[in-house]
Amino acid sequence: MGSVSSRGHRAEAQVVMMGLDSAGKTTLLYRLKGYQLVETLPTVGFNVEPLEEPGHVSLTLWDVGGQSQLRASWKDHLEGTDILVYVLDSTDEARLPEAVAELREVLDDPSVASVPLLVLANKQEVPQALSLPEIRDRLGLQGFLGRSWDLRACSALTGAGLPEALESLRSLLKSCSLCMAR
């Protein structure tokens, strides 16, 4: 993977999406690409898609499989990451401790020490979904001193919150002077 770089007049950034299985990473990936809702299967390995919009940094989105047997390889995808997106199933309160533990393990990796974090609280269309303040507190996001982060509500199913998530991603990228200097 690369990092933010300039090729001619274009800048590119590597975005890695991680999260537990069934959090909605692949559906989010294809919705961000502008596709209508697509049926997905559990990701074995990873999916990679470019996201280019005129006037913006070109993004390469890496959707890394979240099944427990694949998580050991997550660290293999971190080198050269410019933004880490952690997708959380807001309706799966039973697996929240597991999601928190996996996120902390990823963030402990030295290769992402200064990489901004965007947490996408997916499945917000479900009435029982955890609220953003509850997710923020349970993930301990306020304790991530020295790291730029944002938390956004979204729904891969309906597309709600995805434009705001993309804008947040771009804002985090712009604010990351270390990323731009790489």
Curated annotation (Swiss-Prot):
Note the lipidated residues of kind N-myristoyl glycine. Answer: G2
In Gene Ontology terms, what is a biological process of this protein?
Answer: intracellular protein transport
What does the UniProt keyword field contain?
GTP-binding, Lipoprotein, Myristate, Nucleotide-binding
Classification via PROSITE patterns: ARF (PS51417)
The Gene Ontology CC terms held by the record are: cytoplasm; plasma membrane
Function (record text): May play a role in apoptosis. May act as a tumor suppressor.
* Protein name according to UniProt: ADP-ribosylation factor-like protein 11
What gene is this protein translated from? ARL11
